[in-house]
Amino acid sequence: MARVKRGVTTHARHKKILKLAKGYRGRAKSCYRIALQRVEKALQYAYRDRRTRKRDFRSLWIIRINAAAREHGLTYGRFMHGLTLAGIDLNRKILAEMAVNYKDDFAKLVETVSGKLAENS
């Protein structure tokens, strides 16, 4: 059986890792062993933070909706409850967008919700 030399595959693998480590500081960009560790850790952070990003954005939307609702005299919880009572099915992302960029429309929404809350209590 013929001898298999693995220089080509090893070189390709090293090159791939060093390409991923481009922009790192010190030996992490040029030394394979250190670059491998840094790249693996970076990929772990990326995996974790793709999940964290979803939570962060949801909390940001809630903060924005709460701030805008309080300007009109409602808390976030009462506002969301009122939306449910009014049968308005808007997600938090859209509500936050309205609260920041379409203040007049958001004010009308709050009026509608306030009316439903007054009816119900």
UniProtKB/Swiss-Prot annotation:
Domain of life the protein comes from: Bacteria
One GO BP: ribosomal large subunit assembly
Keywords: Ribonucleoprotein, Ribosomal protein, RNA-binding, rRNA-binding
GO molecular function list: rRNA binding; structural constituent of ribosome
Pfam family, one: Ribosomal_L20
Gene Ontology cellular-component annotations: ribonucleoprotein complex; ribosome
InterPro entries in UniProt: Ribosomal_bL20, RIBOSOMAL_L20_CS, Ribosomal_protein_bL20_C
Alphabetical list of PANTHER family matching this protein: 39S RIBOSOMAL PROTEIN L20
Family: Belongs to the bacterial ribosomal protein bL20 family.
Function of the protein: Binds directly to 23S ribosomal RNA and is necessary for the in vitro assembly process of the 50S ribosomal subunit. It is not involved in the protein synthesizing functions of that subunit.
Stated name of the protein: Large ribosomal subunit protein bL20
